[in-house]
């Protein structure tokens, strides 16, 4: 979910931390690169074990992940750049929160170098214990999230939800149908977004969004996948009981996704191009119920 400058000068998404955009002349081509930190994070329980011994103390993650909120959520220090390390500080008592305490990001270009995130549900085939996901969109009775962020950080970064949809129940690797993003805030340079169909203002469950969408290239998944972005009006730093189900149903009504696809999980995090030290998630929760 990296923002990249397209040839037109607009900023477009680079979907998923396992990918990087490389340019050849004036043409842009997506190429899959190794995402060691991400794949290690998907291992989940094994990676978390050492850090879990200090559950009631302040913990620091550097290129690793850990459970928070008991085992309900997973925090991943995902860094896919090549510059100095990045570390996250976890709060005591296992709260669902983290702070970027060390950031070596310094990319002056258009590719983000890191995506520290918190996860509920499934991502790249690994699921947080006890999660109700994956579920078909049509099977969701409710899906809401509360996310509070702290954004007093210098540099170039953004903050958003990342919802992946797959044609089958569990995507063992990259989800193959759609990525629905809900953006809260970002630094100005990487906030200009316009898909081929333009941007429209929509209202979903009483909230105003700016909606844009397009289909990705085919270099990563056969046939590509749909990219749908809902950007919250007013660039808030926090949302309470955000209705994720309503956003997905709105996208389905517009024929951008299918109600038969499976929601894999809910991720929320910050992409960081430069700086970012001090960015924080101070509160996070997801509640999902299914239809009987």
What are the residue ranges of the model-derived segments?
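Secretory targeting and sorting signals
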Residues: 3-49
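Solvent-exposed N-terminal domain segments of exported/luminal and surface proteins
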Residues: 51-107
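Short, hydrophobic/proline-enriched secondary-structure or compact coil segments at domain edges
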Residues: 96-100, 141-147, 161-163, 262-272
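Short, surface-exposed beta-strand/loop "edge" segments at domain boundaries and coil↔beta transitions
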Residues: 104-115, 152-156, 170-173, 238-239, ...
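Extracellular-facing segments of soluble proteins and assemblies that are Gly/Ser/Thr-biased and enriched
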Residues: 114-199
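Residues within well-ordered beta-strands of beta-sheet-rich folds
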Residues: 162-164, 181-183, 210, 248-250, ...
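Short helix-loop boundary/capping segments
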Residues: 168-243
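Long, compositionally biased interface segments
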Residues: 226-228, 232-292
């Amino acid at each position: 979910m990296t923002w990249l400058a397209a040839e037109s000068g607009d900023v477009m998404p680079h979907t998923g931390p396992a990918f990087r955009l490389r340019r050849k002349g004036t043409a842009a081509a997506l190429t899959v690169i190794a995402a060691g930190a991400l794949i290690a994070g998907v291992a989940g329980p094994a990676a978390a074990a050492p850090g879990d011994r200090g559950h009631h103390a302040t913990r620091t993650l550097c290129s690793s992940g850990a459970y928070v909120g008991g085992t309900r959520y997973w925090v991943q220090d995902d860094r896919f750049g090549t510059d100095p390390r990045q570390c996250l500080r976890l709060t005591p008592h296992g709260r669902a929160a983290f702070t970027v305490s060390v950031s070596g990001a310094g990319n002056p270009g258009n590719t983000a170098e890191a995506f520290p995130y918190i996860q509920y549900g499934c991502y790249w085939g690994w699921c947080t214990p006890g999660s109700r996901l994956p579920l078909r969109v049509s099977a969701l009775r409710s899906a809401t999230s509360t996310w509070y962020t702290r954004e007093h950080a210098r540099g170039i970064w953004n903050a958003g939800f990342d919802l992946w949809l797959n044609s089958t129940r569990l995507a063992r690797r990259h989800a193959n149908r759609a990525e629905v993003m809900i953006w809260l805030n970002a630094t100005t340079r990487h906030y200009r977004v316009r898909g081929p169909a333009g941007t429209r203002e929509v209202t979903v469950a009483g909230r105003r969004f700016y909606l844009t969408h397009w289909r990705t290239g085919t270099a990563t998944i056969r046939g590509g996948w749909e990219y749908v972005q809902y950007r919250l009006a007013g660039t808030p730093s926090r949302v309470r009981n955000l209705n994720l189900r309503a956003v997905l149903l709105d996208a389905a009504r517009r024929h951008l996704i299918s109600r038969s696809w499976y929601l894999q999980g809910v991720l929320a995090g910050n992409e960081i191009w430069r700086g970012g030290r001090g960015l924080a998630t101070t509160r996070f929760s997801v509640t999902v119920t299914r239809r009987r």
